[in-house]
Amino acid sequence: MSTKTYDAGVKDYALTYWTPDYVPLDSDLLACFKVTPQAKVSREEAAAAVAAESSTGTWTTVWSDLLTDLDYYKGRAYRIEDVPGDKESFYAFIAYPLDLFEEGSIVNVLTSLVGNVFGFKAVRALRLEDIRFPLHYVKTCGGPPNGIQVERDRMDKYGRPFLGATVKPKLGLSAKNYGRAVYEMLRGGLDFTKDDENVNSQPFMRWQNRFEFVSEAVRKAQEETGERKGHYLNVTAPTCEEMFKRAEFAKECGAPIIMHDFLTGGFTANTSLANWCRDNGMLLHIHRAMHAVIDRNPKHGIHFRVLAKCLRLSGGDHLHTGTVVGKLEGDRQSTLGFVDQLRESFIPEDRSRGLFFDQDWGGMPGVMAVASGGIHVWHIPALVTIFGDDSVLQFGGGTQGHPWGNAAGAAANRVATEACVKARNEGVEIEKHAREVLSDAARHSPELAVAMETWKEIKFEFDVVDKLDAA
């Protein structure tokens, strides 16, 4: 218990919350913020203000500080670093005692770390760049309901990335026509098809009808190909009660996998659904709709690597990560960094990939990285190189935009992927020799040849907005 005398009034945050001599404990939750302070606010004061407002502090001294051990519970700003190439901002490293957070509650962690502090007047902009979750905390979270190895065993598919596609047009199809598209793509060679993130239960296609027609399509494709297939049935709903109603119906239909929009649906709903999937033997695909609102501004918000870590703790078997090469934002090194955070057991600090801390996941299962957004056959050599086997390569327009139809588009993607995996396994640098690898495969696949001709000029060569900070 504190023995300090109560001294009313307002004092600088740095007097209490700036502790440069502090050595973080293994059990501390560590955070790195990019801070852009207001003019005339010192770095130390701004860092301390963030530590205070995200832990025990308020704008004035309060007498009830004497009723607790403030030195034990407070967040501590313990280090400040320059941001390469940015004279306005700096990195503030803050350590939080684990007792500040409810066990297994990502909701509680985020409420503290990215709550009111992000509207604090002492800073002009604030971004949460990374979190180190101590193993003590990781062990209190359920994590992915199944994990990579369990999914491979259930789907009986090994040695290559999974292949998927989002049904297009994403809105407006009737349930019967929607099911037809699913069947054609699965029959053509894909492993999964997917509801778009904004397909819920609209007037043109109510969820029950979609689930029924899609389940029939999956069963038919499985019978004809002899392969296990699946469709991500989106159970995201206006209420948790309705979400579970849809999940139960998907289970009754025999679906192997369901889907949730984890940011718009919320972490409470997501963790609850992950627990249900674990108990009911269901795979869980996670879409990240709304992420760019939160993570794309390089000075304010939350970096996606943090959202990815939070999702792994909350629970999900797949997570969309961008593609690097497609239509969506994504720096290559940064993407490789957070993909490792999804899949590996231990990831060391690596500033070249935007990783500010070591992260130990213990025995928590991994999450499949999903590459989706503006990709086609010409991207496959790069995608296989970047994401490896434990991933889902998901082609929407890159399947259904094929001149010969959905089945041909699926066949082209399957042939191209298997050709790239084979060449890679034989030691070929497939990204460097992409044209030769694909052209050789196309000699035996007219579907691939047509796809290559159709999309040979299609590139998305825009500069990345959210780049890694580098000198």
UniProtKB/Swiss-Prot annotation:
Species, as recorded: Allochromatium vinosum (strain ATCC 17899 / DSM 180 / NBRC 103801 / NCIMB 10441 / D)
Enzyme Commission code(s) on record: 4.1.1.39
Residues involved in substrate binding: N116, T166, K170, R288, H320, S372
Catalytic reactions on record: 2 (2R)-3-phosphoglycerate + 2 H(+) = D-ribulose 1,5-bisphosphate + CO2 + H2O; D-ribulose 1,5-bisphosphate + O2 = 2-phosphoglycolate + (2R)-3-phosphoglycerate + 2 H(+)
PROSITE patterns named in the record: RUBISCO_LARGE (PS00157)
Protein name in the entry: Ribulose bisphosphate carboxylase large chain 2
InterPro entries per the UniProt record, alphabetical: RuBisCO, RuBisCo_large_chain_AS, RuBisCO_lsu_C, RuBisCO_lsu_C_sf, RuBisCO_lsu_fd_N, RuBisCO_lsu_N_sf, RuBisCO_lsuI
PANTHER family: RIBULOSE BISPHOSPHATE CARBOXYLASE, RIBULOSE BISPHOSPHATE CARBOXYLASE LARGE CHAIN
Miscellaneous note of the record: The basic functional RuBisCO is composed of a large chain homodimer in a 'head-to-tail' conformation. In form I RuBisCO this homodimer is arranged in a barrel-like tetramer with the small subunits forming a tetrameric 'cap' on each end of the 'barrel'.
Residues under site feature: Transition state stabilizer: K327
PTM annotation (N6-carboxylysine): residues: K194
Quaternary structure and interacting proteins, as annotated: Heterohexadecamer of 8 large chains and 8 small chains; disulfide-linked. The disulfide link is formed within the large subunit homodimers.
Annotated gene: cbbL2
Catalytic site: K168 (proton acceptor), H287 (proton acceptor)
Entry PTM: The disulfide bond which can form in the large chain dimeric partners within the hexadecamer appears to be associated with oxidative stress and protein turnover.
